[in-house]
Amino acid sequence: MEKTAEKLKVNESLLKTVLCSATFWGLLAHGMVLFNKYSFHDDVRYFNEVGATYESGRWMLGILGSLSANLLGSKNYSLPVVNGTITILCIAAIVYLLVDSLKIQSKPLVILLCGSMVTFPSVTGTFSYMFTAPYYYAASLLGVVGAWIFHQKKNVVALLLCTVLMACSVGVYQANIPVCICTLLLYMMEDIRQSDMNWKAFWKMALCNATVCIGFVTEYFLVNQYFLNQFGVVLTDYKGINHFGRTNLSNYIYRILCGYGSFFYPSTAVEDFSARYVYTLLIIVTAIIAIFVLRKMYILKTPKGCQTLLILIAYPIAACFVYLMVEPWDVHAVMTFGQAFAFALVVWFIDKYPEDRTKVEGALCKAAVALLGVLVTLNIRYSNILYLKADVMQTQMISYYTTLITRIESIEGYTEDAQVVYIGEYDKHDKNLVGISEYFDDLDLATYRGEPIFNDYAWKEAMEFWCGFAPELGDAAEFDGNAEVASMPCYPDQGSIRCINGKIVVKFADEP
């Protein structure tokens, strides 16, 4: 085992620390979703699929879905334990590569970095799409591996391989662009710290990294266009997918400002009120530590200070690059995993600049460590609240559908061959259904929102999945202007379900 590890250059001690930490934090934060099954919204629609692929610009996700189906010889499944474990292991691998390359020495910092990334709210959000979660985070890992290869070798072959891996990463999920850029910037900072490079060497390194970014984005779009032509589809306009990054100059400036603002005050990435302020305080404390470090570099009259400062200026918008890709209001928490790389920057500063610390600097570093620990704890609490909310939502949903099915099948004239017609199916109301708003805060993380789940776009699929009821559906338009339907009350009132012309009509809402 030791010889194998030596040949592969595996840091066994670090590997054990990261795996144990990821397991510990993963169980604390995500145990409920790993050992239960919550399936509604997209998860029930794509239970046996990997999600939207080519029409959403996710060509690599389509390829991976096909490979998985062919290799396993079965459908894709939204498996909580398997998919969740793979996801957490991918995050652990990301942490391992970052820590190993950045040469982080402090074990407590490694444990906290692992915790901050495993418990980050974007992971919680992605677990509501369990059918595709492992693919998303395997893709994030792919981008980090690409940057790691380029950082290790720094030659043309490594550069090309890096761009290919990053293009594949983005081809699974476009929000992996920030992951790729942040990793490149972190490795640049470590290279600057380790050597006294002159400005020529710095700009050469910056140009190489810019070439990587331009290269993988170009490759992504070229391959994407190939698959669009191959399958004869066009990009969807969902969340601005069909016009990623295309806008006017003034809106670019607005998006950049939103990105910087989100880095310091992450109202989308970190929704929990207390965690958001702890995060902001952590970033401020880290910024003060960075100022002290840069001041010492300036006194030593080395270019390191200015070089590091340039990367620090770019880092916030790199972490929040999704704000440049789409309109700020289209950004949701699942898209913000790149912002978790802010914690790698925090840990790097605390671990790498301990020399000649004053009491104030030492106190700031201790405060940053404490804040990181508090943030991880708050994120764990937040995740568990959302999973409990999902459990209650799903239980209420099943109860609602069970009652609905019973009433439909109890109507005089019902037969198993009768078509069922739903009128106003996405505008259901029930004053006696308390819902979850009375017991839970109005948390907006997809897909744990507070709106009635029985009005979800996939409500019929959820009823079929959980209750096994899938009648043949009739066309609601057939009853437009029908006098008998107009006279019917709305569900759940008595008389809201009737057999009309041999079809079971369920009226949820009046016609607009």
Model segments located where?
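Transmembrane alpha-helix segments characteristic
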Residues: 23, 114, 299-325, 375
